[in-house]
């Protein structure tokens, strides 16, 4: 894509009430997706929320991912299934929402349910090698860089740090 070429997303409207994804502010990275009908997301369950759109065209060399909206997660414990939408996908863009609370949540028609975030398409050559190339980290993982002095496992649970965040 040349520096003068405009990045373009074009959608096919599959429901009469569908809205184009849009950003609330010029500096926002995510394009909000809207529900086209009232939907009840069952407590401790999930549902696919229709948005009434199909991807019609995306500038070559780009793809997007369905990402959460922070307000739904913090206020209502709702999170979308993170989904990669490849440039060539032309199916329905319905969003699966998970409800991590134990109460049913009703989403009104027109609710912002998730956002699309664009990414450049980067690929790599994939191959086997006989041995791993040596690296500073080695095979250390799962908290290996935590400061051991920060935790006294005799006095606390790993979950104690999360008590300040109330559940919805």
Question: For each predicted feature, which ranges?
Answer:
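DUTPase catalytic domain/fold
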Residues: 1-168
């Amino acid at each position: 894509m040349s520096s003068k070429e405009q990045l373009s997303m074009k959608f096919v409207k599959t429901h009469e009430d569908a809205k184009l994804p849009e950003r609330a502010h010029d500096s926002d990275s995510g394009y909000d997706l809207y529900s086209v009908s009232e939907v009840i997301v069952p407590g401790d369950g999930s549902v696919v929320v229709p948005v009434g759109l199909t991807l019609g065209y995306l500038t070559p060399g780009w793809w997007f991912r369905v990402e959460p909206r922070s307000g739904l997660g913090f206020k209502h414990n709702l999170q979308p299934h993170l989904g990669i939408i490849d440039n060539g996908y032309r199916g329905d863009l319905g969003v699966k929402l998970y409800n991590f609370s134990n109460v049913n949540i009703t989403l009104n028609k027109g609710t912002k349910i998730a956002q699309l975030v664009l990414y450049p398409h980067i690929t790599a050559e994939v191959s086997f090698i006989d041995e791993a190339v040596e690296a500073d980290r080695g095979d250390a993982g799962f908290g290996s860089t935590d400061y051991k002095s920060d935790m006294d496992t005799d006095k606390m649970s790993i979950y104690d740090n999360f008590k300040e965040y109330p559940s919805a």
